[in-house]
């Protein structure tokens, strides 16, 4: 509890409040209160969170992979940029729709949050299970809708909606590691700082996904999500390079979360700009 005292000046017309703020440790973000406040695994609230993850992952994979299928079957009308925009918009919309319950939709994000003590470890298996189920159901739906049955693994006929390297395995691994780490860093930043309002979280995360798909899509497929790669692999039986899309995004997301945890919080960081937006240093004084 803060210590508040009241005193008057000699003239009796000024009141001074002396407030002793709580220690910084009490207000630092992120907190670890999830250990005591997380719902029981069989509670209605936890089941609602799992349903949100299932539905959200389903629509995420359905929309993003449908854009890929339409682009392949209709003379590349969607284009790479269009596909990237679809992925970004669908994740943005889902964050706004389901974020009040749960909006991971990605096993790498779930594991990264757990590794940084921002998510209960005992809920991880259930989350990953429903995320993979949602991705698999979406992939099965797309297979029926677009009749993608003809030798998709070889890419000689129908397009494979899963993830596969365009170049070497090493190139794809490094790319997935980097872009997923960047995505996770953004997720942690916008969800723990007071500078970002809740109204902007979905927009910023969606924009990050769009950016990653634009420059990494032709290299690794820009999966950033093990569930996004597992679902199509299970439905079509194509597992070439699947280890890349299980390991690289997970390690990348964990590294992104740990990097954010090592950085100073907004309360402790030395301000680079003043409240008016002007720099404390002249441009010529900044290191190049």
Curated annotation (Swiss-Prot):
CDD domains with a match to the protein in the record: MIP
Cellular component annotations (GO), alphabetically ordered: endoplasmic reticulum; endoplasmic reticulum membrane; plasma membrane
Cysteines engaged in disulfide bonds, as pairs: none
Transmembrane segments: 50-70, 77-97, 126-146, 170-190, 202-222, 234-254
Compartments, record wording: Endoplasmic reticulum membrane
GO function term, MF aspect, one: lactate transmembrane transporter activity
Pfam families documented for this protein: MIP
UniProt motif (NPA 2) ranges: 225-227
PROSITE patterns to which the protein is assigned, alphabetical: MIP (PS00221)
Record-linked InterPro entries: Aquaporin-like, Aquaporin_transptr, MIP, MIP_CS
Motif (NPA 1): 106-108
Keywords per UniProt: Acetylation, Endoplasmic reticulum, Membrane, Phosphoprotein, Repeat, Transmembrane, Transmembrane helix, Transport
Chain positions with N-acetylmethionine modification: 1
Gene behind the chain: NIP2-1
Entries under Gene3D superfamilies matching the protein: Glycerol uptake facilitator protein
Entry membrane topology: Multi-pass membrane protein
Protein name stated in the entry: Aquaporin NIP2-1
Main function: Low water transport activity in yeast cells.
Family: Belongs to the MIP/aquaporin (TC 1.A.8) family. NIP (TC 1.A.8.12) subfamily.
